[in-house]
Amino acid sequence: MTTGGHGTDGVERRGLMFVLSSPSGAGKTTLSRLLIERMPGLRMSVSATTRPMRPGEVDGRDYLFVDKPRFEAMVRDDELLEWATVFDNRYGTPRAPVEAALSAGQDVLFDIDWQGTQQLREKARADVVSVFILPPSAGDLEKRLHSRAQDSDEVIRKRMSRASHEMSHWAEYDYIVINHDVDEAFAEVQSILKAERLKRERRIGLVGFVRGLQGQLQG
């Protein structure tokens, strides 16, 4: 039996997996943060990773930091919904907490690349809503990468080279947002999430709700 939580109108619904992907520097991390801050009922998926912890990060909040043998065991035991290798580090989404959230009617936000999105679709297509964020220009993307001041020139060159390959998968996504301005891009992404929450097939309580209305009218 499918379970779910209640939307703002009181109708029970199943949660969804809301995916944001983009080349590094196109704005998906900022947009993800704004969504978590401003959209009730949305929680961030916490990925497992083999990369080293960065200053200010907290294990279990930002990522689940694991070593390579543990990550390989998670892949082998089908504990991950998706996983990918990025710049020699592995990232993956633990299955159990996501499935529990969806069943409770909570939406889960994913900040993952095209490989992870493809794997999510293969395992749970009906639950996935995907958005690809594009920069307004290549020059703007490079400027943003330099302004972050967290990567060397060599790493930035690699990210720019990888960006073209990542963008080649744009047509695999449900929605495309061009991030000219972060406030405008956020408004567009927020509108997508609000509309997807109202999809008939996710609102599993509608059958009972409509029958109740019909009963009132016929009584």
Swiss-Prot record:
Q: Enumerate the InterPro entries for this protein.
A: GK/Ca_channel_bsu, Guanylate_kin-like_dom, Guanylate_kinase, Guanylate_kinase_CS, P-loop_NTPase
According to UniProt, the reaction catalysed is: GMP + ATP = GDP + ADP
Q: Report the GO molecular function annotations.
A: ATP binding; guanylate kinase activity
* Highest taxon listed in the record's lineage: Bacteria
Give yes or no: UniProt keyword Cell cycle. no
Location(s) in or outside the cell:
Cytoplasm
- Top-level class of the enzyme under EC nomenclature: transferase
- In which residues is ATP bound? S22, P23, S24, G25, A26, G27, K28, T29
Q: Which GO terms describe its cellular component?
A: cytosol
Q: Where is the Guanylate kinase-like domain?
A: 15-194
Q: Tell me the leader sequence span.
A: none
- Which EC numbers characterise this protein's activity in its record? 2.7.4.8
Assigned keywords, A-Z: ATP-binding, Cytoplasm, Kinase, Nucleotide-binding, Transferase
Protein function: Essential for recycling GMP and indirectly, cGMP.
Family stated for the protein in its record: Belongs to the guanylate kinase family.
Record-linked NCBIfam families: guanyl_kin
- Protein name as annotated: Guanylate kinase
Organism, scientific name: Bradyrhizobium diazoefficiens (strain JCM 10833 / BCRC 13528 / IAM 13628 / NBRC 14792 / USDA 110)
Which gene produces this protein?
gmk
